[in-house]
Curated annotation (Swiss-Prot):
One GO CC annotation: periplasmic space
UniProt GO MF annotations: metal ion binding
Subunit-level organization: Monomer in the copper-bound form. Homodimer as apoprotein. Dissociates into monomers upon copper binding.
Domain of life: Bacteria
Signal sequence range: 1-20
Chief location bin: periplasm
Subcellular locations according to the entry: Periplasm
Induction trigger: By Cu(2+). Maximally expressed 30 minutes after induction with 0.4 mM copper.
Function: Involved in resistance to copper. Can bind up to 2 copper ions. Has higher affinity for Cu(+) than for Cu(2+).
UniProt organism field: Cupriavidus metallidurans (strain ATCC 43123 / DSM 2839 / NBRC 102507 / CH34) (Ralstonia metallidurans)
Keywords from the named record: Copper, Metal-binding, Periplasm, Plasmid, Signal
Protein name: Copper resistance protein K
Length: 94
C-alpha cells in the first residue's frame, strides 16, 4: 500500500512539473490580421489561437499574414499543446 502511494505521488509530481515546463515553451506570439494569434514553441512548432482565445486547427504549410504585413508559414499544428497552455492561464508568449 505504501509503495502504491509513493508511486502515485511520484507520478503526480512528474505531471505537475511537465505542465509547468510546457507553459514556458511559448517563446513568441504573432498577432494576425484577422485577430487570431500564432504561438511559437521552443521547438519551432506552432499553435493557432482564434480571436476568441480558443485553440484552433491550422494546416501545416498554410501562409498567414501578421498585422504588420509579414508572412509566416505554419509549422506543426500543436492544438492540444496550446489548448493546455491556454487552459492554464497562458495568453502571451515572450
Amino acid at each position: 500500500m505504501k509503495q502504491k502511494l509513493m508511486v502515485g505521488a511520484f507520478i503526480a509530481a512528474v505531471s505537475l512539473s511537465a505542465a509547468a515546463v510546457d507553459m514556458s515553451n511559448v517563446v513568441k506570439t504573432y498577432d494576425l490580421q484577422d485577430g487570431s494569434k500564432v504561438h511559437v514553441f521552443k521547438d519551432g512548432k506552432m499553435g493557432m489561437e482564434n480571436k476568441f482565445g480558443k485553440s484552433m486547427n491550422m494546416p501545416e504549410g498554410k501562409v498567414m499574414e501578421t498585422r504588420d504585413g509579414t508572412k509566416i508559414i505554419m509549422k506543426g499544428n500543436e492544438i492540444f499543446r496550446l489548448d493546455e497552455a491556454l487552459r492554464k492561464g497562458h495568453s502571451e508568449g515572450g
